[in-house]
A protein has these predicted regions:
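Intrinsically disordered, low-complexity polar/charged tails and linkers
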Residues: 1-151, 155-159, 163-183
Length: 183
């Protein structure tokens, strides 16, 4: 399916089993030139232009593994490559890995101008917030999917986040185009 928007980021997650010690990961990052910052319960790693957040495993639930978040990918192929890169970083064999897409960030243009403040003032029935700051933007949430949100700018640019389903994003974007047209 062809979408009328561009994917700017995919946030994915992976369950790593067995768990891996933070000290070992920090050492491997140092050896391979990856940027790694340690926090109490997580490691923030930047490697090969991707960001990884590795969380500590749960000690109360043995063999539960660890949670890894991945960002900085614009396609599922890039996500799979990032997972392979991370596995190489920690010295694990690459192969098939189950991952989940948690969120897409997308951008597009609408083909008509919107008076953001007027739209905000005349649509109290919608979940909408108008930000009047230096770079004005209108935050508009989907009436069908409460986590799905668009930021609409006076430049006609639209950023959409809050779904792991591209068809939901496409439907929301088409709804935005319809609801913002002045009759």
């Amino acid at each position: 399916m062809t979408y009328s928007f561009t994917i700017t980021n995919i946030k994915s997650s992976v369950k790593l089993k067995p768990s891996i010690e933070f000290d070992f990961v920090v050492q491997r990052c140092h050896e391979l030139g990856a940027s790694c910052k340690r926090f109490r319960n997580l490691l923030s790693i930047h490697y090969k232009k991707k960001s990884f957040v590795l969380f500590k495993g749960c000690k109360r639930v043995p063999n539960s593994g660890q949670h890894l978040n991945i960002t900085g990918c614009r396609s599922t192929n890039k996500t799979l490559q990032a997972i392979e890169d991370f596995n190489r970083l920690i010295g694990r064999p690459t192969g098939s890995v189950n991952y989940r897409i948690d969120n897409y960030s997308c951008t597009s243009q609408i083909d008509h101008r919107i008076d953001l403040e007027s739209f905000y003032m005349s649509n109290s029935n919608l979940r909408v917030v108008y930000n009047r700051e230096n770079f004005p933007g209108l935050f508009l949430w989907s009436p069908k999917k409460p986590k799905l949100c668009a930021t609409i700018y006076h430049t006609k640019k639209v950023n959409i986040v809050g779904s792991n389903n591209l068809e939901e994003i496409e439907d929301f974007f088409n709804w935005i185009k319809d609801v913002t047209v002045i009759n």
